[in-house]
Design a protein with these regions (language model features):
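Substrate-binding/catalytic cleft of secreted carbohydrate-active enzymes
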Residues: 104-331, 336-356, 364, 390
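Secreted/periplasmic carbohydrate-active enzymes, especially glycoside hydrolases
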Residues: 1-123, 131, 135-139, 161, ...
Length: 545
């Protein structure tokens, strides 16, 4: 790229084993600012006497919380909306390759409509943060910990953790706050006065924050973070009692929802997300809100489910979206992302499923999530109306749900039953979504995210596994097992056989050091099987074997 500035420092003498900081200051005239929609990055090359060099990417931007307690990026107010991310993947935990660390950032921004996220509850992979820089996703990064505060030697490790975090990640323009309080811990004013001062000493350019579940707590940081679950059953949020203030967690813990729960619960989970977002946008002095959580995750205690999985996410642990994910996706501006429309309903001829909906008030009611101006819903080819969004129930939401009354029951379904939603912007069709009735399982479907990966021993691709009907739709309540065979120089990571969860699940295919073609086959009883191929190619860069 074009060199815009070049400077040299004074000569420094550094003894063997010594560490020294050398400050070089320079100005960039008329800089290209880093922002959400144009995350421009500069590269700074630092060289030591022609012997060694390192390249760092930076973004030039200004951040602050203004007198109205709102966040400003480059002088413009940004309402911080996002979710928490546990760096946890099925079968691999946190030890996932860079490809999928980066992809999580893409999911947060482009599939879940986030402009902001929290690294709960620890610093996360550099490759993830690099991707946040590249796509314009704001980050709150915090020191490791959860609830427990130890003795003085333990606290010394916390000081070191803060130091390491800030030194490692200082150059990331996406990071806008440092978390200097152990998540959900009790007050310890002496300890947290020191952590706050340390962060300010190491980085005076960024505000500090801390996350607590205490409504009345010592406010020692620059921004008050609060885990707000008190009004979750109503989908509400409390009013700020300190300023600046943001909600660091909401909803998920209080209404865990599996991808294979009944439709009534799944829709209610989505509706509560819409209601919580509506409450956030209603507040004129709440800087941000991050829901709990983006993805389901493994846990070390049961949390009531007995399988060591927390079902608090907008997606399942495989990053397969639940219905609620589309509430968040629909909040993105159609001009900045793309128009979308989604029917939050399955057409399943199941007696008990229909009656569970009746118990929870959803029989005949169909929610449609869209960022279009109008939506028309068709059932069996007949229009159920062309509606505006429900801004009476969700008056502050950028794009409220559309609610249709559709008079159907399972007894009236036929093999040709279908439902279609059409979204309109400026009176013209902008998006379309269709559901057909699911009657019986017909085939196994395998979909690899990537058909080509590097043969370096750690690169991999996710393979989404589905049991589908005659229309190619996954069966939302199917639990059948799929058995795999793998041919070629690869490794299958996951369960074999693998039971479906809501008709879908996933495995991973990891490369070895050998190039070639891998064939993965999925079989389930007498259903049509499926085979895919994945190419392992020579690595593009250097690696450590």
């Amino acid at each position: 790229g074009k060199v815009i500035r070049e400077i040299s420092s004074r000569e420094e003498q550094i003894a063997a084993g010594e560490t020294k900081q050398v400050l070089c200051e320079f100005e960039v005239n008329h800089p290209h600012l880093w922002n959400l929609n144009d995350p421009f990055l500069y590269t700074v090359k630092t060289e030591i006497s022609g012997q060694d060099n390192v390249e760092s990417r930076i973004g030039i931007r200004s951040i602050r919380f203004n007198e109205n307690s709102l966040f400003e990026l480059n002088g413009k107010v940004v309402k911080l909306t996002g979710h928490n991310r546990h760096q946890n993947f099925p079968y691999l935990g946190g030890a996932m390759c860079d490809r999928y660390q980066r992809e999580d950032a893409d999911i947060l921004k482009y599939q879940l409509g986030c402009n902001f996220m929290r690294t709960s509850h620890y610093p996360q992979a550099k490759s993830f943060l690099d991707r946040c820089d590249e796509i314009g996703l704001l980050v709150f990064e915090e020191l490791p910990g959860w609830q427990f505060i130890g003795d003085e030697s333990w606290k010394q490790l916390c000081y070191q953790n803060i130091t390491d975090m800030i030194y490692r990640d200082y150059n990331h323009p996406s990071i806008i706050m440092w978390g200097v309080r152990i998540n959900e811990s009790l007050d310890d004013d002496d300890f947290y006065t020191k952590t706050n001062a340390l962060a300010h000493e190491l980085d005076p350019t960024r505000p500090t924050t801390g996350v607590r579940y205490l409504r009345e707590s010592s406010f020692l940081e620059d921004v008050y973070g609060f885990n707000d679950y008190h009004l979750a059953p109503k989908g509400e949020l409390r009013r700020p009692n300190y300023h600046p203030y943001f909600v660091s967690e909401y909803l998920g813990v209080m209404f865990p929802t599996k991808s294979y729960d009944n439709i009534g619960r799944q829709v209610e989970f989505a509706r509560r997300h819409a209601s919580s977002l509506n409450a956030f946008y209603r507040s004129s002095d709440m800087a941000g809100a991050t829901g709990w959580s983006a993805f389901d995750y493994n846990t070390h205690i049961p949390f009531g489910h007995g399988d060591r999985v927390c079902y608090h996410g907008l997606t399942d642990i495989f990053r397969i979206p639940k219905l609620a994910a589309y509430v968040n996706q629909s909040q993105a501006d159609a001009k900045e992302s793309k128009p979308m429309v989604f029917i939050a309903k399955y057409l399943v001829p199941a007696y008990f499923e229909d009656h569970e909906e009746l118990d929870q008030g959803y029989r005949g009611r169909t929610y449609v999530f869209s960022n279009c101006e109008e939506v028309e819903l068709f059932f069996e080819g007949e229009s159920m109306g062309r509606l505006k969004p429900d801004d009476e129930a969700f008056p502050y939401l950028p794009h409220p749900p559309f609610v249709f009354e559709v008079p159907y029951t399972f007894q009236g379904m036929r093999e040709t039953t279908h439902m279609e939603a059409v979204g309109y912007i400026d009176g013209k069709e902008a998006a379309r979504f269709e559901r057909k009735i699911s009657v019986r399982a017909r085939a196994v479907k395998l979909e690899a995210d990537y058909s080509t990966i590097e043969a370096n021993g750690y690169d991999l691709t996710r393979v989404v596994v589905s049991v589908v009907d005659e229309h190619g739709q996954y069966l939302p309540f199917c639990q059948l097992p799929v058995t795999f065979t793998l041919e070629g120089p690869g490794e299958l990571i996951g369960e074999n056989p693998l039971g479906m969860e809501g008709g879908r699940a996933a495995v991973y295919v990891r490369s070895t050091m050998e190039t070639g073609v891998v064939k993965l086959t999925g079989k389930c009883r007498d259903l049509d099987s499926c085979e895919i191929q994945i190419n392992f190619v020579k690595p593009n860069g250097t690696f450590v074997s």
